[in-house]
């Protein structure tokens, strides 16, 4: 009974191989009775009103599409494809290939066998048809046992054969005893031989694989049969019973991920996993497409025809062949011996003894461990079935749910939700790809329309140009001749007038030089007299100046407080601008690379058109023969060069356009590089501001010290000035006098621009060393490198000092460019009398606009950086050179200024943005 139940259970398990029934496997494993009960209950839980196929198909067509995006339930096709994609359904990837290794040889073999079957065989001939040597050898291996049967007296009793060996030995021993003591063996042998011969004659025309050919055995091998080995069956039944009991008593949790069982429990085979790896299916499809492309339909038909002809030839060759010539002469004798031995082994006595021995052994096993075995323990089985029925009756509320095993139930809505989550990435990906493809198609259509229109416009323009050129050539020739003669006469008159004018200017300049020398001597004498009169009031003015310095220090501390608040904002803005410039530069570099590649392609196309045009567009003789009429030949020979020239002109125009775009991008890249340098300088400026603010805090703390003297405040000049502190050690009168005399008594002639020398508004002293003039080229280089950095450094004095140490001493700080003060204004206080202010107040008032000028210039630089993307480089035809001569003094300006000659500073805030822009570009 236990053996039968075990076989039934294994049969039930072997049937359930479909991955769709994986979730119900544990429920079926309980037992045959429990399986029937569960199946009946599940049938009762099925819906009472089944849908017809036509209705479901109609609803799918009308309501649901293949892929849904609006949250509606998915269609059956979508669910099927999702299951197939994730390996839930059975696919051909789960099985090995069923094709033949060598199609030609197999077809020849098959043809030979069929031909031999068609041959006529005599009815008395009991010889079997030919069997291959390999098949014969395999039949012998299966028939004969590896361990020969020995009599019991030859086997020592002390040898431990083990469970399996002992069972084999006892089975063979029972068979020997049954054969030795059975009197009716001969009659049974005769009956079986007669029946076998009848069967052989009856099924002689059947195929080879439908009969068992080994009916006789060799008498030299008395133990040639394979013993009935039930050890594996029993071991497997025990393991399955124990596992089922453990599963009932201690159920394990099944891991699920997105509604599918994970790892090995999901039913996905290793072969399926290998096939569904990333890129495997694409490789298989690609190889299949290559094979189909390489073997066209006619070639594949030709291959099948060749195989058919080969098989037909082989069949014709063996059609009249006698089967006896292919078999072994001793084959009939061996077959008779084999059949005799099989009849002896298959006798009822042997089978009964073997069955009794097997039942006795199974009863011993069942009686030994009854509490662990499921089979043979009817009480245990009934109790398990009753408990299962009680649990099932309690959970009647799960009637409309799907049982997944292990106590897990799911509603159809949850299953649909899981399937929807699994298929939504596929749906989104398909929709995204479709939308991208539609956008690309629209863009291609739009571009094609634009290109066609441009091509038509270009053709019309070329036609109009050719017509106008013919009319303008004659008129332009005569007009150029007349203009040449008029220009020649006009240039002669202008040259004479220019010579006369320059002579007059030279005389005027000589007179002005004499007057300037006389004025210089008079001014020197007058200044010496006035200095002697004004030195008495210098001490009072110096005290007032010290008070003004203290006020300036307080004002600077207030400015420092507000600057600290805006420091971090400026630093963040500078870093963001720096990152934006880097990103814009990378984009421009990518566009430059694309344009270079496109220009190379255009050059290649132009070269190909040139070679075609140089070849003369000659038509080969073979192609001429294919042209039907003379008119078509004329069109081919005349229109083709025109088309080639038009295509070549089109490629040249596109290449010229892209070269212009490349030049513009290169200019924009240079501008962005300069702006990146500006951003880096701004970062350094903010860092130096922080250090300057820390040092200034120390200065404010030391302001209340009683020993703090005026020398500390007054010894902070610009970097280009050499200052002696004004204090108790030297009188102000001696200091001012010595500095004035050292400035104007240096010997030799001093040009008229000496009156424009400026003094600082902080230190209150004159410049000690004269400045060395620099060339225009050197000034431009210094402006290009330092201007953008110095403009932002003008807000902070400490940052200005650090930059001035690194740059050339010829570049003035931005504070001095705010407005120069002549010596007459400083000594005679002309502007102060007009405005009603003291000297110290005028000095402090002049320092305030510097920050405003620098801030305005900084904002202008930011707008200039933002306009770089919209500028177009078209040479110097947009008025960019007009500012190059802005520093020269014209005749009208010379007359208006008189004796005052002021040189325009490169850092002056009045310089135009165009001038600074083109200086950076060049």
From Swiss-Prot:
- Give residue spans, biased composition: Acidic residues: 889-898
Q: Where is the composition biased (Low complexity)?
A: 871-880
Q: Name one Pfam family in it.
A: Eisosome1
The record's Gene Ontology biological-process terms are: eisosome assembly
Q: Which GO terms describe its cellular component?
A: peroxisome
Basic and acidic residues compositional bias, start-end: 687-703, 844-870
- Listed Polar residues bias regions: 1-21, 751-761
Query: What induces or represses its expression, per the UniProt entry?
Result: Expression is regulated by the AZF1 transcription factor.
Q: Which family does it belong to?
A: Belongs to the EIS1 family.
Q: Tell me the PANTHER family matching this sequence.
A: EISOSOME PROTEIN 1
Recorded protein name is Uncharacterized protein YKL050C
């Amino acid at each position: 009974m236990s053996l039968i139940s075990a076989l039934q259970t294994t049969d039930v398990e072997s049937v359930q191989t479909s991955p769709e029934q994986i979730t119900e496997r544990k429920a079926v494993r309980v037992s045959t009775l429990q399986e029937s009960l569960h199946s009946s209950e599940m049938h009762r839980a099925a819906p009472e009103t089944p849908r017809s196929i036509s209705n479901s198909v109609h609803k799918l067509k009308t309501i649901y599409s293949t892929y849904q995006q609006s949250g509606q339930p998915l269609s059956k096709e979508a669910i099927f494809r999702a299951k197939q994609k994730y390996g839930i359904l059975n696919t051909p990837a789960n099985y090995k290939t069923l094709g033949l290794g060598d199609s030609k040889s197999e077809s020849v073999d098959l043809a030979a066998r069929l031909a031999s079957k068609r041959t006529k065989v005599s009815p008395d001939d009991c010889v079997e048809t030919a069997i291959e040597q390999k098949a014969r050898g395999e039949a012998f291996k299966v028939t004969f046992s590896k361990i020969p049967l020995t009599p019991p007296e030859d086997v020592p009793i002390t040898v431990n054969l083990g469970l399996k060996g002992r069972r084999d030995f006892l089975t063979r021993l029972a068979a020997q005893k049954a054969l030795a003591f059975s009197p009716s063996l001969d009659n049974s042998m005769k009956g079986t031989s007669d029946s076998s011969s009848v069967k052989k004659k009856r099924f002689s025309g059947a195929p080879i694989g439908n009969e068992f050919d080994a009916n006789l055995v060799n008498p030299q091998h008395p133990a040639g049969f394979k013993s009935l080995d039930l050890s594996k069956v029993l071991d497997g039944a025990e393991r399955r019973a124990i596992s089922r009991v453990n599963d009932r008593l201690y159920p394990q949790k099944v891991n699920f991920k997105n509604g599918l069982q994970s790892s090995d429990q999901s039913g996905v085979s290793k072969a399926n996993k290998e096939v569904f790896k990333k890129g495997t299916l694409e490789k298989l499809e690609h190889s299949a497409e290559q094979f189909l492309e390489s073997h066209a339909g006619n070639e594949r038909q030709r291959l099948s025809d060749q195989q058919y002809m080969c098989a037909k030839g082989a069949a014709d060759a063996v059609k009249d062949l006698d089967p006896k010539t292919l078999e072994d002469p001793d084959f009939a004798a061996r077959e008779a011996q084999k059949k005799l031995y099989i009849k002896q082994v298959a006798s009822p006595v042997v089978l009964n003894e073997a069955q009794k021995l097997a039942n006795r052994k199974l009863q011993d096993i069942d009686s030994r461990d009854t509490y662990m075995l499921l089979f043979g323990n009817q009480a245990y089985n009934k109790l398990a079935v009753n408990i299962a029925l009680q649990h099932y009756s309690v959970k009647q509320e799960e009637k409309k749910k799907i049982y997944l095993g292990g106590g897990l139930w799911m509603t159809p809505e949850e299953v649909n939700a899981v399937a929807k989550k699994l298929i939504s990435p596929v749906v989104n990906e398909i929709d995204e790809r479709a939308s991208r493809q539609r956008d690309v198609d629209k863009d291609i259509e739009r571009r094609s329309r634009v290109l066609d229109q441009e091509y038509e416009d270009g053709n019309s323009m070329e036609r109009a140009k050719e017509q106008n050129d013919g009319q303008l050539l004659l008129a332009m020739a005569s007009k150029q001749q007349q203009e040449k003669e008029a220009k020649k006469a006009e240039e002669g008159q202008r040259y004479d007038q220019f010579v006369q004018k320059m002579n007059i200017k030279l005389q005027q300049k000589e007179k002005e030089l004499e007057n300037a020398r006389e004025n210089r001597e008079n001014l020197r004498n007058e200044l010496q007299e006035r200095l002697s009169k004004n030195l008495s009031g210098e001490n009072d003015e110096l005290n007032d100046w010290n008070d003004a310095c203290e006020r300036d220090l307080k004002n600077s501390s207030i400015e420092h407080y507000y600057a600290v608040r805006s420091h971090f904002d400026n630093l963040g803005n500078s870093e963001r601008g720096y990152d934006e410039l880097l990103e814009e530069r990378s984009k421009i570099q990518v566009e430059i690379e694309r344009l270079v590649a496109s220009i190379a392609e255009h050059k290649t196309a132009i070269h190909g058109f040139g070679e075609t045009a140089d070849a003369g567009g000659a038509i080969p003789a073979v192609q001429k023969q294919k042209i039907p009429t003379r008119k078509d030949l004329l069109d081919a020979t005349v229109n083709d060069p025109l088309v080639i020239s038009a295509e070549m002109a089109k490629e040249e125009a596109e290449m010229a356009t892209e070269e212009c775009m490349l030049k513009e991008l290169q200019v924009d890249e240079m501008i962005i590089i300069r702006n990146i340098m500006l951003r880096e300088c701004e970062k350094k400026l903010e860092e130096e501001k922080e250090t300057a603010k820390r040092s200034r805090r120390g200065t404010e703390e030391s302001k209340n010290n009683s020993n703090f003297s005026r020398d500390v405040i007054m010894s902070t000049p610009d970097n280009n000035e050499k200052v002696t502190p004004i204090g108790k050690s030297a009188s102000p009168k001696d200091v001012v006098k010595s500095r004035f005399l050292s400035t104007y008594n240096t010997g030799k002639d001093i040009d008229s621009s000496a009156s424009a020398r400026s003094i600082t508004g902080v230190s209150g002293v004159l410049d000690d060393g004269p400045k060395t003039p620099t060339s225009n080229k050197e000034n431009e280089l210094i402006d290009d490198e330092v201007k953008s950095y110095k403009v932002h450094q003008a807000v902070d004095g400490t940052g200005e000092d650090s930059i001035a140490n690194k740059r050339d001493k010829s570049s003035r700080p931005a504070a001095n460019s705010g407005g120069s003060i002549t010596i007459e204004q400083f000594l005679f206080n002309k502007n102060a009398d007009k405005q009603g202010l003291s000297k110290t107040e005028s000095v402090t008032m002049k320092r305030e606009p510097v920050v405003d000028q620098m801030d305005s210039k900084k904002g202008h630089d930011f707008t200039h950086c933002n306009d770089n993307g919209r500028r177009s480089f078209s040479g110097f035809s947009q008025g960019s050179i007009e500012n190059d001569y802005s520093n020269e003094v014209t005749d009208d300006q010379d007359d208006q200024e008189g004796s005052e000659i002021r040189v325009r500073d490169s850092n002056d805030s009045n310089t135009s943005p165009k001038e600074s822009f083109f200086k950076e570009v060049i």
